[in-house]
Amino acid sequence: LLLAIDTATKMAGIALYDQDGLRVEEMWWSNANHTVELMPRIVRACEQQGIAATTLTGVSVSIGPGSFTGLRVGLSVAKGLALVLHIPVIGVPTLDAAAYAHKRSTLPVCAVLPAGRGRWCAAFYQTDADSWQRCSDYTLIRT
């Protein structure tokens, strides 16, 4: 059972996955309230699914680009759960996660996230016959 955490942007989210796929997903607008909102939502999602935290087998967490404070909150919760439950934690680049939602696209995908101060982070992705992959470096664009 995998817990996924994304607190990189103001649109935060969590999800629980098992061998059968997505069990529960919740996304919410978090206006700099990640610290207060994240753990109660994880607890509620587990309770709604009848899942004890001790049954988690791994945690994935967004690692940026994104809000420094938001990333710290997500990484701290992920690392804390991993240490207490003795489970692995894996970091997932935020742009990769955003683009992955479009992995079936036959056209190239450009994932873009605001980086603050008039800057944007971007990367290009494409699907070929066998795989989906990033086909550019992560780029910081100044406007």
Question: What is each PLM-predicted segment?
Answer:
Residues 1-63:
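N-terminal beta-alpha supersecondary unit
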Residues 21, 33, 88-143:
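Surface "functional belts" at beta-alpha junctions
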Residues 42, 77-81, 98-102:
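Buried hydrophobic packing segments
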Residues 15-17, 73, 124-125:
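Short amphipathic alpha-helical segments
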Residues 47-54, 83-94:
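Phosphate-handling active-site elements
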